[in-house]
């Protein structure tokens, strides 16, 4: 049988390579077949590859691995954009070019030209196909008999002889929670065995357990009078004042506390949550925010402040820009209003120190822009920590 010319292993597909036994400095080409590739050294193969051009290397790579299955589909297509760009990318010009090309390009020729009124293909008729296959009496000629009750007797015997503990697990797996208590049901779902604590029968009594006693939180025992005196004296050790949940403190004492806090240059946290203060007592906080360079956290949640006063408090933080956390949620008037929300949003965007704001905005735009402003402030803090200029 003669060898075909297109055979891959024919003599025409051999290539020349320097012999491994030839002397150094001489290059005597010799034909190497597939069986002789094992005798070649790595240096000879590297020399052959280095002499190939880029196009030849690409063809060789396609022959060895036309479609690398180890790569994801998005990386299998090789770069075919070798042509240099003629100019900057302009989307409008590209769309106009594609539109003009689509209008001027000739449509594909149809093998069967369109003729009005002519139907192509077979029209589907569900009734005709069904009537042709089904008999007149509506039954199949050779019905298939399926017996689903072959193992009914064995199943009954297994259920009768099964212990009640296994029946409890089976009821839990089948979701029959009405005949089980909660520990039995959840143990069956998790695959845990029933024990004496949960009960192994349907009528078993579950053992009681002593509930864990959680002690109540102690009352706030802050001495308001002592805080007022220490704030007036500008005590360097007093950096936090917390009178949360102290509704029995009189309004006059709260006003005096806020006025005394304005004299302190070392206070960092001031909490007045759930103290039933209104706008008349909280107006002094505006002066406190504008004059205190050390104040970092202000908490006035769960009070009776109006949205207008909250907007003024946020606007006053722009004077020193030292407030890091501002909490004012859960007020009597839950709806702030669109105009007030926009005012608060702009104040937060202008502030470069706020990191946490506890206010519920109803507007989607306000929530989105406030979130972006706080992210920018966090980025400034990160750049300062790395020793970079946040304004660059």
From Swiss-Prot:
Q: Where is the composition biased (Basic and acidic residues)?
A: 76-90, 122-138
Give start-end positions of Polar residues composition bias.
16-29
Pfam families per the record?
A: Tropomodulin
What's in the keyword line of the UniProt record? Answer: Actin-binding, Cytoplasm, Cytoskeleton
Subcellular location per the Swiss-Prot or TrEMBL entry: Cytoplasm, Cytoskeleton
Region of interest (Disordered), ranges? 1-30, 59-90, 118-138
* One GO BP: nematode larval development
A Gene Ontology molecular function term of the record: tropomyosin binding
**InterPro entries reported in the protein's UniProt record:** LRR_dom_sf (IPR032675), TMOD (IPR004934)
What's in the GO CC field? cytoplasm; cytoskeleton; myofibril; striated muscle thin filament; terminal web
Major place of residence: cytoplasm
The entry sums up its family as follows: Belongs to the tropomodulin family.
The subunit structure is: Binds to the N-terminus of actin.
Q: Which PANTHER family match?
A: TROPOMODULIN, TROPOMODULIN, ISOFORM N
- Job description of the protein: Acts as the pointed end capping protein which maintains the length and dynamics of the actin filament. Blocks the elongation and depolymerization of the actin filaments at the pointed end.
* Record's protein name: Tropomodulin
Q: Which organism is it from?
A: Caenorhabditis elegans
